[in-house]
Structure formats: C-alpha cells, structure tokens
C-alpha cells in the first residue's frame, strides 16, 4: 500500500476517537528522522514492511491517547529540544510566552531565579541558556521529574541547580525572580482536559486542590519571606483564574503592582508581580 493511502486510513480512525490526525505523520516523520520534503516524496511510494510495523505502533499508541511527544520522546520549547516522557508534562507554546516575557522585561543584569514546579526543566533551562550570567535554581516535588530535568540540563549544557521541594518548603532564597507554571486545573474541570492529556500526563502536575488555586495560595504565603525588595514573580495561570490569582498576590504583596496578561489567543494566561514601571 502507498504511504499516503495508509496514513489516510489511520488518520480517519484517529479522528473518530477524538485525536488529531496530524499527530500520526508528525510522529512518523520524527522517528524516521525525515525532513518534510522526504515525507512528501515518500507519500506516493509503497510502504516497506518495517515501516508498516512502525506506523501501526504509532497509530495504536495515538488511538489509546498517548501524546505524540511521548511516542517520539521529545518536545521543542523555545528553540530547544527537551526529552519528555510520562514523568513530566509536555511543555506548551503558552509557556514559551512566559519565558519570552521574562527575558523581555529583565535585562542582562545578574539575577537569582527560582523556577517552582520545573517538570522537564523547560522554563529554567531555556532561561539559563538565554541568560548564562543568571543564577538559576529549579525545584519540584517529584523526584522523577527532577531526574529528567537534570538530564535535559546536561544534554543542553545549561547551568541549573535542582532541588527537591514542595513549593518553598525546603528553599531559603533570597531570590530576585520567581517563575512558576504550577498545577492549576481544578479537579471539577476534568472534562475540559483532553483525553491524551488525562490518559498519559502526570496528574500531580495537572491538578490542584482548592478549585485549582492551592499552589498559588502556597506561593503567595511563602514567597514574601524569600524575595529581595526589588523581586518579581511570574506565573502561568488558567484562563479563568486571572482575577482570583491577582487578588491573592495583591494581598500578599500590598506594595507591589500585580498585572494579568493575555496569551496569543487573547486568554488570561500570566500574572506578574513587580514594583511597577510597566
């Protein structure tokens, strides 16, 4: 059978179970290490038996809601390729916007930075590579996630120190900047989560108690004691959480400015705590 015909057959079945059809060709090309041109040229060729087996394997995993990034074992973030598996969340494009904002609003001056809930290490490592003179620390409550983040730092030659901690329980600071993309989905909103996310990605990194606000509340309680006077806090939030998270941090930092910023899709996505000037 021609590759194009086999892909079309599998893609139709993936759509029927609510998966994105493009994930199949994306994963296949990645595992074959093909360019897009290689892929296009192969569409009208017969599929070798070995490749039929590979395609079937990818299809079966996608059909059972395994994300394509887990199948290929990597995800791109801020121009870098990170190893990902079931130990960590797959980095999202929205989080790239958070990193870009931090780099845009903070110049080359050396800062002490903490990434809370680092997961794959995507935020901390991307910042470390862009600002090599900053002192970057990254924490997570999951030892498995920290192990993978450490692997990513080594692979990408980023200088980041990793620490096991539940938010700031085992951290002392002082820090000039805290960034976090914490678990923020309420357990009541489980129906809003995609099937592949729910089936494969770690729930510890997805869901938070107290309607999704538990980690924000803990950061707001603990951060004032470990931050320098000029320090800033950058948070990713759920699209419905802007007002509540802003209120939490305005109470925790009454003398600072708290901003809610939108992502590229026009949804509330980031909260920034600083001394003003923006």
Predicted regions and their residues:
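Alpha-helical elements of Rossmann-like donor-binding domains used by nucleotide-donor carbohydrate transfer enzymes
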Residues: 9, 26, 54-57, 97, ...
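An acidic site on a long C-lobe helix of protein kinase domains
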Residues: 51, 91-94, 215
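SAM-dependent Rossmann-like transferase core, predominantly class I methyltransferases
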Residues: 57-131, 136-151, 272
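Alpha-helical structural context
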Residues: 30-31, 105, 130, 252
